[in-house]
Amino acid sequence: LHSDLSHLTKYTCNDMVVDKDGHAYVGNFGTTKHNIDVVPTCLIHVAPDGVASIAADKLEFPNGAVITPDGKKLIVGETYAGRLTSFDINSDKTLSNRKIWAQMMPTWIFYITKIRRFLKQVAKESGYAVRVPDGICLDEAMGIWVASPTTFEVFRIEEGGLVTDIVSTPQRAY
């Protein structure tokens, strides 16, 4: 699968998930290395023939993503919003019915991160450990394992936000 995505985003692309039919959903940073401001950005759909389009917009650094085994739901980690957001996958592979699947970051922290790019700086200054999603993995019980680089852990979270398991890591978890 090859596709030029530069007409859809000017930011560096990052994690991607591919469904059983070969359709890819690709996230991006929503910022550049030289830009302090973080802006909402998009999740890009790439069809097997390479045709790309915007699948969802106004996401805060769409990062790790999973597709449920039935192929009907996509869940993406929004790193800068500290949440997992779900979408229904329609038969034409478009996304609809956006919902917050689990909120990890308190709203007040989210507004601070709109001003400051690095969440670790917020945590350092506030003394508050801010969980954010990076890479994610869906388990057989429909829980999501989340790598959180800001808290040096991988944790399991259920829909609605209940954290059921935590594994501390000696280094940042991505």
Locate predicted features.
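Short loop/turn segments immediately following beta-strands, especially the blade-tip
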Residues: 87-95
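Beta-propeller fold detector
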Residues: 1-4, 53-57, 95-105, 165-168
